[in-house]
């Protein structure tokens, strides 16, 4: 399980009305949907560098199945080994689609609402379905 952290001042998070409660809700659903799986919370590179704060801290690692990861592994390598990807609005969700995942999305990023994601809050204005190739081409 891969849960993606984002920085607190990320424009995509702010546009999705993301806050501490939404990130906590996302982690809760990841635990509920996959109760026996290990959850890796991938910190943002700028959080790791000490430049911008993220939403998740060690306090969110409430069991031995949840851990923060701020290492150098490629996001592609992390996704390859993940059974699911959770994000609010990170572009990692788009990359997850390209990698063959159907990410769980809790915000309103450009890639949500086209039938390629599990949307916690469906995007009502998007009424048609796209393939991953169509979404990639549009972007």
Language model features: what each stretch is:
Residues 2-10, 43-44, 108:
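Short loop/turn segments at strand-loop or loop-helix junctions that form parts
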Residues 3, 16-33:
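Histidine-anchored nucleotide/phosphate-binding helix
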Residues 10-12, 49-50:
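Short, solvent-exposed loop/turn segments at secondary-structure junctions
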Residues 14, 115-139:
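Leloir-type glycosyltransferase catalytic cores
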Residues 17-21, 55-58, 101-103, 118-123:
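Short secondary-structure boundary/capping segments
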Residues 27-70:
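Catalytic donor nucleotide-activated moiety binding site of glycosyltransferases and closely related
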Residues 66-72, 124-127:
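Short acidic-hydrophobic, aromatic-tinged amphipathic segments that line or gate anion-handling sites
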Residues 72-117:
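A donor-sugar binding/catalytic signature common to diverse glycosyltransferases
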């Amino acid at each position: 399980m891969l849960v993606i952290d984002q920085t607190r001042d990320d424009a995509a998070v702010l546009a999705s009305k993301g806050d501490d409660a939404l990130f906590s809700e996302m982690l809760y659903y990841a635990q509920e949907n996959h109760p026996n799986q290990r959850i890796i919370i991938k910190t943002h590179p700028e959080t790791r560098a000490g430049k911008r704060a993220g939403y998740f801290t060690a306090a969110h690692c409430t069991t031995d199945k949840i851990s923060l990861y701020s290492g150098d592994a490629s996001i592609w390598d992390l996704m390859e080994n993940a059974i699911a990807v959770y994000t609010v609005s990170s572009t990692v969700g788009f990359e997850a689609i390209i990698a063959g995942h159907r990410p769980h999305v809790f915000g309103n990023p450009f890639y949500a609402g086209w039938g390629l994601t599990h949307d916690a809050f469906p995007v009502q204005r998007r009424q048609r379905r796209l393939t991953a190739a169509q979404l990639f081409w549009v972007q």
